[in-house]
């Protein structure tokens, strides 16, 4: 049987459920190697070492940030020597895994990550060297997800992002920017910017509810109004039509701003004044369940 590598976020090294699930697969005859991350860059190094182990699948065991780091390293490998991606959701929000209908039960998720059908999915590339598999968020949404305290995440899980956002409404400030892409141009002040390959962010909020991960397109949604924010956020996260929510789909877009703005790429912040974001169609293979709603 082909070899599999599990890259496990260091925070989960002592997780007994993970250890049990790994043992069960090994008892079935699966050759499953495990590497634990300690610091930034470990996941990339483990991915690069995977070729020497004749690995067919690399499993990202952690949250959205871990998945991002593994996927970003995979796309850098030659296509002929690129393992498939498996996902073991162990984070706070697990936005990408949840929207893909990957089970949150550790044993079920690990079985899927090893034995599931591999399908081609898109990645999004930012400024030629950064990537996201799920979503890039800007504006108020970025500040919520990057500033939510770890203790609040531990207690409340995905809901912590929304609650922390309510607590921080006094800090709301729009980002002035220009956005253009094929057949689309807009300039103004945006409270929330969502650029989705996947659909949800911030602990289960469907910011880009129509996005697909294999259509060669990104869904862009902008919240531009200055009216009462709670009502607007309800519209954004529920998918309701609202004149202050602008949306489109496009294969690439460019964003320019007179000042630094910060985007959250699957949980990882990236700041600058100029961004080019484009889809890489069929970038990697990912093991997903048959009922994954993000496949067109």
From Swiss-Prot:
Alphabetized Pfam families for the sequence: DAGK_cat, YegS_C
Protein localization: Cytoplasm
GO MF, one annotated term: magnesium ion binding
Needed cofactors: Mg(2+); Ca(2+)
UniProt-listed PROSITE patterns: DAGK
GO cellular component: cytoplasm; plasma membrane
Keyword Ion transport: no
Gene3D superfamilies for the chain: 2.60.200.40, Probable inorganic polyphosphate/atp-NAD kinase, domain 1
Residue positions binding ATP: 37, 63-69, 92
Function: Probably phosphorylates lipids; the in vivo substrate is unknown.
Name under which the protein is recorded: Probable lipid kinase YegS-like
Organism expressing this protein natively: Yersinia enterocolitica serotype O:8 / biotype 1B (strain NCTC 13174 / 8081)
């Amino acid at each position: 049987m082909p070899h599999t590598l599990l890259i496990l976020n260091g925070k989960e090294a002592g997780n007994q459920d993970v250890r049990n699930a790994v043992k069960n697969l090994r008892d079935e005859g699966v050759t499953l190697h495990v590497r634990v991350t300690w610091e930034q860059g470990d996941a990339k190094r483990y991915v690069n070492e995977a070729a020497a182990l004749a690995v067919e699948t690399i499993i990202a065991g952690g949250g959205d940030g871990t998945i991002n780091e593994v996927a970003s390293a995979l796309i850098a490998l030659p296509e002929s020597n690129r393992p498939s991606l498996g996902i073991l959701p162990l984070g706070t929000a697990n936005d990408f895994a949840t929207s893909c209908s990957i089970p949150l039960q550790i044993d079920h998720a690990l079985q899927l990550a090893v034995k599931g059908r591999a399908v081609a999915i898109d990645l999004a590339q930012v400024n030629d060297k950064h990537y996201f598999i799920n979503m890039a968020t800007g504006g108020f949404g970025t500040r919520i997800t990057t500033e939510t305290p770890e203790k609040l995440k531990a207690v409340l899980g995905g809901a912590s992002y929304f609650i922390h956002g309510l607590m921080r409404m006094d800090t709301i400030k729009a980002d002035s920017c220009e956005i253009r892409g094929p057949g689309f141009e807009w300039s103004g002040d945006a409270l929330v910017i969502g650029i989705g390959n996947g659909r949800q962010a911030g602990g289960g909020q469907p910011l880009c509810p129509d996005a697909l991960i294999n259509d060669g397109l990104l869904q862009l949604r902008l919240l531009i109004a200055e009216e009462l924010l709670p009502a607007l956020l309800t519209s954004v996260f529920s998918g309701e039509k609202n004149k202050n929510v602008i949306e489109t789909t496009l294969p690439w877009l460019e964003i320019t701003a007179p000042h630094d703005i910060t985007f959250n790429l699957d949980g990882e912040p990236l700041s600058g004044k100029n961004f080019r974001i484009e889809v890489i169609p069929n970038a990697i293979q990912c093991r997903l369940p048959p009922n994954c709603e993000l496949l067109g």
